[in-house]
Amino acid sequence: MPPRLRGQRQNSEGEFLDHFCTTSTIKSKRESDTESLHRVPIRSTTMPESQRSISVSLLLALPVILEVGRVRACRLGSATECEKAPFVPGYNLAGEGFDVVRMRRTGAYVINVKGHLADNNTCTLCPNRFHKGQIQKLPSSVLDWRPFSRCSKELSSALHHSVDSLLRSSSSLVNNNWGVGLSLDQIGKVVLGGSRSDLAKFARSQHNVDRATFAIHEITCTYYSYRLADHPQLSAAFTKHLKGLPRNTITSQSRALYRRLIDTYGTHYIHQVQLGGKVRRITAFRTCLATLKGFSEAEIKKCLNAELRMALGFLPANASYSNKCDMLMKGNMSMGFYQGFMTHKIEVTGGEKYFPDILYQQDPSDAYHSWMNSLQDNPDVVSYAIFPLHHLVEDSQISANLRAIISEYIQENKLQGDQLGLKNCSPTPNLDHNCCPLRAGRGALKLEIHRAASLKADTFTKTDAYVKIFYNGIYEETATVLDDDNPVWNATYYFGSVEVGQELRFEVWDRDVLYNDQAGVCIIFPERGTHSLSCQLRKGVLYFSYSIKCDAHLSGFRCGRYSPTAE
């Protein structure tokens, strides 16, 4: 027996009028009305308390009265009018399936967004103020359609230090809690939404090369919004697919049928939308390499913001970068990740022209304004509310099965902490909070003075030997070994993080009562690694060893080369 489906069409006249009344509560804010309201003169006169209350109530009600006058522009249209009228822009952008794992629309409709006539052969018609008041129709499943303008020339920007943080921010485009009812709360520190999205692939590819910081700059323009009815008519294809699902307890065979539905329609459907356009640029820069080049995260973010504002025409044509920004942009904007330390991903949503290379065109500001002007005719979804698909199924057993398979699919694709570039770091003298070296050419120096042989500092007595050690302003001195031409010290010295490659100087001395005699001097320039050496003195031989371990992310003989994999 086929399952009963939630949302089968019931187009009684009463329900349609309820739909019409809901649609006609559209608010269309206009500055002129607000300004007129602010200019209403209020005289300071003495009046009875009752009259004063009535006057205040009327003033408070005035905005509502103005709105009612405006929203009645939507009306019922005859069948002839409905056939002639075009749909509102973006009428079919809700009702589509949505996959939260890939954080994208599936292109398959679960809701019928093409039907516009009620059983009494009427539809809802509304004037579109962005199309010179042209009368346009709404699908019968659409409620609360509203034209409004919300555009800004201010770029929003943010920094993210991990794949985890970046993906969680991208999920903010979904403006409701999409996980309600899917039993996903107890999974722990993982990323669920967008775990297999294009953004996740981009971010992880950068983190696999090197520790990356992500700077996001975006600008959004919104022109329309609407939502679907709570029990919309389902699409014929989705209805047919649901009827083919088994009601029995999930088996390997039935699981495949449910997973096929998810492959086609996703995990959710889009219930509410805001339409317009968005330009978003994600810049991944190699955190530690940027630090070594002398650019802080805040400086890079500021320079990128100025560069994009200039490209979009938000700044005067004669505006210029600061010297540091100019050096950053000209020297490091290569798309090759190893050639510079930044790479970009540009996303353009909405509009009739796609311009991923906006920053490299002859006149990108013209391209941007042309794209912006096309949004009123060709909007796309800039934010949405989504609900799980099982909410649309009236058969309780099939709904429960679908809910379980959706939860299973989302959990299977989660990203664990070790896949997200998360790393704890304790700052050290040459490491910052991101575990990045602050300066190249530095490493930890360890020195061992072992012994000396055949010292002949005095003619008639044996040597009272000690060693002076000098390194880049650091001084150490061994203990004195009395009456021994072959002294043994086995003394160890830790110099900490030092600048590698400076002069390491040893002076061997014979301590006497009146004045000390120098047995000889030895000079070397330390390099990375462990080295055991002997040094011929003027009177004898000195034996010692040293080791240098480059600071994190540094390599090379003198630790002067940046290496993402070096620990």
Predicted ranges, named:
Residues 1-47, 508:
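Intrinsically disordered, low-complexity basic segments at termini and long loops, enriched
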Residues 51-73:
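Cleavable N-terminal signal peptides of Sec/SRP-targeted secreted and luminal proteins
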Residues 67-428, 432-444, 448, 455, ...:
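Membrane-permeabilization and membrane-interfacing ectodomains
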Residues 188-189, 449-485:
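Calcium-regulated, polybasic anionic-phospholipid
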Residues 447, 467, 491-523:
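Eukaryotic beta-sheet cores, primarily in C2 and C2-like/PH beta-sandwich modules
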Residues 457-459, 478-480, 505, 516-519, ...:
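Intrinsically disordered, low-complexity regions enriched in proline, serine, glycine
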Residues 482-487, 496-498:
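Short proline/glycine- and polar residue-rich coil/turn motifs
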Residues 509-567:
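C2-type phospholipid-binding modules
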